[in-house]
């Protein structure tokens, strides 16, 4: 309060007393850290420019002195710019603040470390020169000229600035504008400019930026969530270990760990190859229920004529004599227990190929069943097994069993379904004579699987309702069915068959009960014939 009284008194006295006031105010301002010479010059100028009465002059002087006092206490910003605290009085008067003057643009090049040359100024973005400079503000301590306190820190914002960018962002914008100039001029951009920008954005410095880009950095995602080693599998054990493999493109994990967390059922099911399916289908044979046939014994003294028949099981059943016929297609079902013999073992009897009445067994057609050389007057004839055919493979004569061997034979009777796609023609048996004709059936020459059957019984009947065709299969020594019988012993022994019913009887066996119907038999009923196959 004393300072205010002295100021008011000194101003109202006269100009001669202004020196004492200058000394008093100067000492007070020096102690407070503020230069009071500016306030004195302002008060003197205001006193000289007034043309009013002495009271008005005293009032204006007192207001100016009080303003200088408050500014000294609050460390306010002076209302006059001065280039240096040691400038002259005339210089200070010329630089007195005028609110109508436009502020000069502030050059940031000296703060960001860029060159102040004309070329560098031209390389800057146009809008950089139009942004107003930051304003001055009061500070409790620091540096400045004439009491101007200004914080020009490179790391943060201006305290009182409402501008859109910080100084660091200004520097980056200038650098990007320079890079843009290089690009528009089709000149390679120096690596120093690019590296500095990457380092400013990427927190790890030496490591390359992540695949998330720079946008996530500005959004606040560049922190602990960023992968320090992009491109590496992120599979860990929850501790320090991490998989060293490279990750699959656009994925987090490598090929080994990419399916680790998924359920097993989501993996694609491996489709079996066509070969596996074909092999499975070929190995699976379709079998039908086999019904036993009760065979009756007949006279042992009947003569038996034997002829070889071979039935091949495979995908194709082709008779060499009728390969060109279009009706050799059909569906045939055979049991899976067949004889496995080499191709050259069965003796093939092909006679009367010019016969126009082929007989189809399944979808196998033969030339004819009529063979006048082997005609017998007995009621039935059979297809028997012969092991001597392997020894006499080149011989085309029939091997007949002696009468002694037929008494103790154990025979297997079972029904075999026979299906045909085309109607089969029958042999000429119009006179209903008990005449047996034997002719071998060549069913297929392609496969090694063959079935040798015993003598075929052709029995004339009178339009019977029963249309089943039972075929008796003989037992074999080594296999389930179809092995050749040993003819060197008088009473050969036979192994038991896993399928069918074993019956102790002679070759002359008649069976009236059967279980499988065939279109062959249906065609034969019209001619009065009934085919009966048994052994």
UniProtKB/Swiss-Prot annotation:
Motif (Bipartite nuclear localization signal): 232-242, 260-267
Domain of life of the source: Eukaryota
Region listing for Disordered, in residue ranges: 260-308, 417-437, 514-535
Keyword Transcription tagged: yes
GO molecular function: ATP binding; transcription cis-regulatory region binding
Keywords of the record: Activator, Nucleus, Transcription, Transcription regulation
Disulfide feature: none
Regulation: induction: microRNA 396 (miR396a or miR396b) negatively regulates growth-regulating factors (GRF1-4 and GRF7-9).
Domain WRC: 227-271
Subcellular location: Nucleus
Keyword Nucleus included in the entry's annotation: yes
GO terms (BP aspect): DNA-templated transcription; negative regulation of cell population proliferation; regulation of DNA-templated transcription; root development
Comp. bias (Polar residues): 272-291, 426-437
Any one annotated GO CC term: nucleus
Compositionally biased residues, Low complexity: 299-308
Tissue specificity comment: Strongly expressed in actively growing and developing tissues, such as roots, upper stems, and shoot tips containing the shoot apical meristem (SAM) and flower buds. Detected in young leaf primordium. Also expressed in mature flowers, but weakly expressed in mature stems and leaves.
Domain QLQ intervals: 164-199
Matching InterPro entries: Gln-Leu-Gln_QLQ, GRF, WRC_dom
UniProt family annotation: Belongs to the GRF family.
Additional information: Overexpression mutant display larger leaves and cotyledons, as well as a delayed bolting of the inflorescence stem when compared to wild-type plants.
Function (record text): Transcription activator that plays a role in the regulation of cell expansion in leaf and cotyledons tissues. Component of a network formed by miR396, the GRFs and their interacting factors (GIFs) acting in the regulation of meristem function, at least partially through the control of cell proliferation.
Assembly behavior: Interacts with GIF1.
Notes concerning its domains: The QLQ domain and WRC domain may be involved in protein-protein interaction and DNA-binding, respectively.
The protein's name: Growth-regulating factor 2
